[in-house]
Amino acid sequence: MLLCNRKVPKTLNTCFILHIFTLLTLGVLVSGMPSKMVSFASQETLQRINNLLRGSANRDVDIIAEYLKKDDDDDGGDKDHHNIDIDPLPRRPSLTPDRQLLKVGLHGAISSDLEVCSNLTINEVLLKFPGSNAADAAVTQALCKGMVNFFNSGIGGGGYVVFSGKDDEDHLSIDFREKAPMDSHKFMFENCSLCSKIGGLAVGVPGELMGLYRLFKERGSGQVDWRDLIEPVAKLGSVGWQIGEALGATLELYEDVFLTLKEDWSFVLNSTHDGVLKEGDWIKRPALSNMLMELAKNGSVAPFYDPDHWIAKSMIDTVAKYNGIMNLQDVSSYDVHVTKPLSMKIRKGANFIPDNDMTVLTSSGSSSGAALLAALRIMDNFQNQEGGDYEKETTYHLLESMKWMASARSRLGDFEGEALPKHIEEVLDPEWALKAVKSIKRNSQDGNFKTLENWTLYDPAYDINNPHGTAHFSIVDSHGNAVSLTTTINLLFGSLVHDPKTGVIFNNEMDDFAQFNKSNSFELAPSIYNFPEPGKRPLSSTAPTIVLSELGIPDLVVGASGGSRITTSVLQTIVRTYWYNMPILETIAYPRIHHQLLPDRIELESFPMIGKAVLSTLKEMGYTMKEVFPKSVVNAIRNVRGEWHAVSDYWRKRGISSVY
């Protein structure tokens, strides 16, 4: 019987119990370390799980109970939320960022979370093969990130990429988001909502490899072989590398989990198998390395998706072991969604770039690119203000645009083909933005700025989904090409399912679907556009973006990780760049602001840095505020007078850019 796909049986198997144990023992990350443990489930759900566990000899209920604490978050929302989508690093913005974290390149640049991967990509691809381009480099960069920071991305997941070339017809958007298995249906998590987060049922069909291969075939330089892009990463996994701060801290957080699941996760354990490897230790991933070498020799990704190949068979066996429903047909039938990027003009004749049309390219498909464009269209009705960051009027405009953007996101969902569905066309219609602009102007008469008194006035259509996790990188090359790519396995270590034969860590992307008959605490129904269906991709908050100058040259390449904070972080980065005329270093380092409409409050990364005067002004406008642990990570590259200024979000994830 497939667990959670129907009524939960009275006797749970061992692996499911261990996964429930895993979910309940992870903690909220405070000041970079798990200083207090908080359950991720409601008290009702916990009681149901405890009742099930009482009949098991595998785990004493009392051991689990000591980890359970009352959820004291005051957001008024669903208590089944969690904070297991971000690494446990100390994260803090900066008003005085170190200038050495701004990297300046004459030929090209890579902005990502991992300097080791950016250096490897530049040396082994862009410099080793002079004719290679950003699309080629993106393959190596993505695979390297999944190899090293395997807690938040990898070939067991999926994502989105936007490519821009010299000509308009070169621009491309690829949706390689995971797909729901063909046996999926909207009732599948009705009896066990936690099963969308952990175990085999949480796994969507991985798409990262197919997406990277399609990018390579469609927009690669043709001057480098597929094998040349894969081998450097395979060799890294074979030889190994020194564990950095982010991976070390995340492994430490999950130590009890991996000791419990040591049979499948032995590669993260020390030589005596009584603990995980630590920061500074040497780690190898031989299984993944061997599998990548097989793909390199094959010259394609065919073995990964071939139902008769040992790679695909091993993956399916592993997912089935943990009660998953993904089968060989799901894997063999997976395809990506290739379209032109969504695009629009901004800042025509704006104060600081006279007579200049900036073209914004962003992702289509199941991403939130359409919502980002809707917010930019709203913001484009308001004037620039140099130095306007956290000024009264500009901040009001930005916050209200964020709230309307959340309303737009509630209408989004996966679709196929080039034509946009009516519910997505609606939010891209200038009339929709005009409605928001009129509301903003009506409530800011004579300098008296007021947010709308009730969130319902922003007209969200459905519950606003809250995705998690993610990793992003931006690349520009010496030929004028750019890549903005965001990829994820969703929560930390995805579904916690690892195939020790192939080295694949599987996503838990099924958690990003809406759950049928489960309205949120604000009585908003789940989105009809985002229910689990066979072959469907769940809605993502991802919005990898490239901004082109009037000459068609990449001017800003940007994207973010951080779940629902992705779109607001990308929006604020673009607004700071083109509305406030801020340098890219300060744009990324400074504290960020976030509003997703529900819960109806502003989230601020640092009250002290923003200051009492600004906080008082926001309160007068009618906003409720909460200081939060920084959760979004932005990696971007800016064209400054022909030079590439690359900045990674060191302040939130220790990223350092690389240039050449």
UniProtKB/Swiss-Prot annotation:
Residue ranges of the TM segments: 14-34
Family: Belongs to the gamma-glutamyltransferase family.
Protein keywords: Acyltransferase, Glycoprotein, Hydrolase, Membrane, Protease, Signal-anchor, Transferase, Transmembrane, Transmembrane helix, Vacuole
Extra information: Present with 672 molecules/cell in log phase SD medium.
Protein name: Glutathione hydrolase proenzyme
Residues forming the catalytic site: T470
E.C. number: 3.4.19.13, 2.3.2.2
Keyword Protein biosynthesis: no
Factors inducing expression: Induced upon nitrogen starvation. Repressed by ammonium ions. 6-diazo-5-oxo-L-norleucine and L-azaserine are irreversible inhibitors whereas serine-borate is a reversible inhibitor.
The organism of origin for this protein: Saccharomyces cerevisiae (strain ATCC 204508 / S288c) (Baker's yeast)
Membrane topology: Single-pass type II membrane protein
Reactions performed catalytically: an N-terminal (5-L-glutamyl)-[peptide] + an alpha-amino acid = 5-L-glutamyl amino acid + an N-terminal L-alpha-aminoacyl-[peptide]; glutathione + H2O = L-cysteinylglycine + L-glutamate; an S-substituted glutathione + H2O = an S-substituted L-cysteinylglycine + L-glutamate
Residues reported to bind L-glutamate: R177, T488, N490, E509, D512, S540, S541, G562, G563
GO term, biological process aspect, one: glutathione catabolic process
